[in-house]
Each structure stands twice: as structure tokens, then as C-alpha cells.
Amino acid sequence: MKLVLIDGEHYPDVISWAIKKLGDVCCAVFLGGSEKIGSIGEVERKIGVKVYHSPNYLDALRRALEENKVDEVVDLSDEPVLNYEDRFRIASLCMLYGVSYRGADFHFKPKPLKKTKKPSLAVIGTGKRVGKTAVSGFIARTLKEIAKPVIVTMGRGGPEEPELIEGDKFEITPEFLLKFAESGKHAASDHFEDALTSRVTTIGCRRCGGGMAGFPFFDVVDEGVKLAENLPNDLIILEGSGATFPPYRADRYVVVVGAKQKLDFVRGYFGTFRVSLADIVVVTMADSVGEERWKALRDAILEINPDVDLHFIAFRPRPLGNVSDKRLGLVMTSSEALPKAKKHLEGLGAEVPYTSDNLSKRPLLWRDLEGFRGIDAVAVELKAAAVDVVTRWALEQGIEVIYLDNEPVNIDGKDLRKAVLELGRALLGGRA
């Protein structure tokens, strides 16, 4: 059945004519405008279907979607009642309810979201380089206290067939990763990073393309989830890729937002869809912005999802090896995070004479590595060219490789670890 969006800038006779041409219309939502109508009751009598209305048109649309079996929302409105921002808000709400939304020259159609057979938690982001994998790894480490999680990742460098890494059963060494990379595979994929930093079982999957709302174009996540469901693990963590997420309706959601992202990517477009899904929102790299930005992010997120548990965190480098009394070269992707990471490692007793923020820029990375002289070890995040460039270079030079994790630390007085444990207990105690 169709739900139509209507306004008072169209005469009721015109709306009635359009509804008859559409056919199969169960109800309408009145968006506003009064130039060409009298009362809502008059409109309802003229068009012959129930009309939902509210001072907030999204509340009316939400109620209509919950009370009717709607497959498609059809937009019969226009400027000035609706603008581009309004239409993205409507599209986000339609994605949340799993219904199609189309107008005269646009069509947003959600992919069907499947359910896992085991309790599931999705970790998704509002963009790339927001620290989603670091947050996912932290969640897995935390939930190991009360569960046996398995992480299903999806990535543009992921394997064509789901790849199982039993990170809880063997040590992932630089030599192992390099050998894997030399076989032609991407050894810095998220499932390797999660297995290395959290010592849990992970399953890596491939995806290609990502739509505006976050649905992948092609992926092999179904096969990965089936594999996870046949393992003895009791909780599945579904990890997104960039702003794209696995096509599953998880039981719980953690949404990761970068503090320096454009605010419109959070409160507009399909950011509202992602934030609406969240049980917990983690704003990462919050130490890189001021109070005014904190307030803007808080206001935007809570306006979309008033009940969400909101956390502002900073990342602290967590070396997966001893750095004390060692002379290090430090390699990362973020130029902004680099000075803070250097200072933190020096606080752990390391000397850090050389740094590079070109981990994702291979030609510049090679140049930087050639300047690293007289070091005992290289500390590097497991992403981008960490294995096939940095690890290979270090092992050829006889230099120790120490991989870095990014540990989320609250800077807002709250406790993300406690929140994750509470979410995990609620999830394991009974699925929504």
C-alpha cells in the first residue's frame, strides 16, 4: 500500500486526481501550507483517505507508518512546503521503517534487512576515518568479560569468500601478516586488526560500493554471518565499513561519529537515519574540538535521538608490545593524531625521534621510512600500508614491529566500558 505526502499548496481536487492515478493509497500525511485548502477535514473528505497531521510532520509520518501496512511513501508535495533538507529527513525516516520513498524525480529504496539467528550488535559510522574499527575492537574486548563475541567485518579490501581468523587461539605476528600479504591478500583488513587488538574470532568479508543511506552495492556478508552462526560464539558484532553497514537489522547499534565531521553529515542527509538507529553514539576525537562544537554535536544528536546514550571520547595509542627504553619510528594515518600519540608513547618511556603521517600515501611513506635512522622499533597502526610497506621494510632492516591500537577514553566524565557492558547484558538477556 502507498502513503502519500500532501500539502495545502495543492487544491484538494488536484490531490484527489493524483491519488486516483496512483492507486492503492491507504492514507496521507499533511505536511503544511494553507493557500489552497480549508480544513484538514475538508481535505480528508475530498481525497477519500485518512489524513494524518501534526505540528511536526515527522511525528505524523511516524504514526502513519506504524498504524498502516505501507510499502511506499509517495511525495506529492513541493516547494515551498518541503525543501531538500526536509526530504532527506523524510527519506531517513522511511529507511528506518524499511519503506521506499519516491517523488517526481527521485527514488530511495532500502535493501531488505535480515535478522541474525544469534544476538547481534552493529558498530556503524557516519563516515570513513572516524575510528570505527578501534571502537569495535574495544567493544569486543569489553564484551569478552560476559560473552564470546565474533566480529563480522566488511571492507573494500576484504576477501571474496568469508575469511575466518581465530584471534583468540594464536598470536598474530608481523611475520604472519607479511606472509599473508605476500600471498596477494590484504593483511591490514579490519578483521585482522580486530583479531590482533582484541584477540577474538573475526570473519572478514568483501563489499563494493555504498549507497547514500549506507547499503552496500555488492557484498558477501550473508556468507560471513552464516559462518558466524555456526560457530560456538554467542554474540555477533557486525562492523560497518566507512559510512556503509552490513545489510542486517541488528538487535543493538553503536554509531560512531567523528567530532570534526561536517555537522550536516550528522544532522542531515542520511546521518539522521544512522543516528536514529543508535543505542549508543560515540563521538570520537572529541579532544580535537572545543566546547562550542561539543554543544552543536550534542544538540544535533539528541534532537534526532533523545534517548541515546552519548559519549565523547579521545583515542590513546595502546602499543601491543613493550616500548619502554626503545627508540621508535611512529607511523600513522592522521596528521592531527600524530603529535598526541608521540607524546603518549614518550610518556610510556619511549624515545620517538621520527614520525610519519603518510601511512595511506605509499610514495611519501617510502620516503619517510628511508629517513628513519638508528631506531629499535617501528610503531604503526594496522591499516593501509602497515603490512606490505612498513612491516616488510622493518623486517628487512631487522627492526622490531610494534602494532598500535587506538583505545577510546572518555573525556566527558562518563564510562563507555560500563555502557557497553550494560548494553551487552541487555542484549544477551533477551533480544528486542
Swiss-Prot record:
Origin superkingdom: Archaea
Keywords recorded for this protein, A-Z: ATP-binding, Cytoplasm, Ligase, Nucleotide-binding
InterPro entries listed in its UniProt record: Cyc_diphosphoglycerate_synth, P-loop_NTPase
GO biological process, one term: gluconeogenesis
GO cellular component, one term: cytoplasm
The keyword Translocase is assigned to this record: no
Subcellular location: Cytoplasm
Reactions the enzyme catalyzes: (2R)-2,3-bisphosphoglycerate + ATP + H(+) = cyclic (2R)-2,3-bisphosphoglycerate + ADP + phosphate
Gene Ontology MF terms: ATP binding; cyclic 2,3-diphosphoglycerate synthetase activity; ligase activity
EC number in record: 6.5.1.9
Free-text function comment from the UniProt entry: Catalyzes the formation of cyclic 2,3-diphosphoglycerate (cDPG) by formation of an intramolecular phosphoanhydride bond at the expense of ATP.
Family: Belongs to the cyclic 2,3-diphosphoglycerate synthetase family.
Name of the protein: Cyclic 2,3-diphosphoglycerate synthetase
Taxonomic lineage from the root: Archaea, Methanobacteriati, Methanobacteriota, Thermococci, Thermococcales
Chain's gene name: cpgS
